[in-house]
Structures are given as structure tokens and as C-alpha cells.
Amino acid sequence: MSRLHRVIFFAIATTVVAFGQGYFPHVTWGGGWQMGVRVVNLDSATTAAATLSFYDNSGNPLPVPINGTIVAGVYNFTIPPSGAAALSLPADGTSVEGWARLDTNGGSGAGLVMFTYNTTGKPDFSATIPFIPDGSGCIIPLPASTPQYAVPFDNSSGNATAIAFANTDSSNANPTVELYDESGALIASAQLSLTAKGHSSFMLTDKFPAAAGNRGTIIVQTDIKKVGVLALLVLPNGTITTLLPLGQ
């Protein structure tokens, strides 16, 4: 992820889900990255009790410095009716990555995550990372007997694609990743290993050299239904575009 961590981006996502059961498939802070989380209670009558749980690439609880205080992987807070909570993670220190789960009990939760990397004399760039509801590996939850997702990629003309996976289940996952070019020809494939509650992210060409100079479609098939997938398209000028997967 060192190449991805050098990319400058700001990410924001909002998805309204009753009781806020879901997750963010990629989070990062430190190493110049600042991360913000904002959770809104859309219920005008009921207080929401919210929990954010953070996990590292190996599925272990990830200590996080939230609002100046380090917590041991789990942060509990409440949101008043029609209220909101803003959480901040600093840009200083060593870069850290993983994924985060949001659960709210009572009220009606909506999640928002922000990442920013500020470079003096250069504009901030933006992209979107979604809050994914439980039971779906993508923002558009289309059920399938074997969970399968299609994600576009573009590594042509100086563009670069990064991809992230989050295993939100308590069992190991072994997703199969296949890359097809625009003619429909299979150019690369591999099976990944994700530990329980684990996470992985990488530039596509780091694991699939055949993707260099190509564009097409990434097909991800998972052996369990609780693997979230997300891709980011990095343009030559540093601008980031989120490539949301679609269920098949």
C-alpha cells in the first residue's frame, strides 16, 4: 500500500441504513493522512448508541487515536435525536490502514468517512468511499447464491487502479479475483486469503502486472457473503475516482 498511501485524496460517503449496521471497507490515517468520521442520527425522537470497531489487516482490534485519545479498537458514543457526532484521527505518526465497522442501537444511523492529505501549494483531491450495509459486499446490494462483484479498472494513459477488501466475517475468506480486458479476454487471476476480520489493499499492478496499460473489468467471487470490495481510480494529476462494485 505504500504507493496508494502516496496518493492524495479526500473521501466522503453517506448511506442511510436503519440502525446503522454496516462497515467501511477501507480506512487510513497517519503518514500525512487525516481521517474524519461523522455519524448522524436521523431519528428525531430516539437517542442512538453507536459503536465503531476498527480492525487491522490481520483482523486484530486496531488501536485508534480518536479526538486526541487512544482507544483499544472500539469507540462507543451516543448521538442525540437529530444530532451528529464528529470524530477525528490525526495525520501525524506512522501510516495505519484497516477497515471499520459501525453499529448503532436505537435511532437511525447514517455514516460518513473522510480522508484528506494536504500538500502545500496543491489542491485537495476527492473521491467517495461508501458505508456498506450488512449482507452486501457492495453499495448496491444485489443478492446472489455465490457472492460475485464486478468492478471496472483502468490502468491506461497513466491511470492507476487500487483495490481494497474487507472480510467482515469471523471465518477466513478466499476470494477469487479475475481481470478481463475490454475484449473480454482473461488476462490475470489469483485467489486471495483474508483472515477473519482481515483487510487487504494494493495497487492492481503490484499483484497483477498484466493489468499495466490495460483497462477492463475485475470480477471478484467470494466464498462467503461478508467480503466488501472497493476500488479507486487514480488519474495522472492525482485526482481520485471511486469505482463502486456491482453485485451480479
Task: Kindly give the residue locations of the regions a language model identified.
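Gly/Pro-rich, tryptophan- and cysteine-flecked surface segments typical
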Residues: F19-Q248
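Positively charged n-region of N-terminal signal peptides that target proteins for export
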Residues: M1-R6
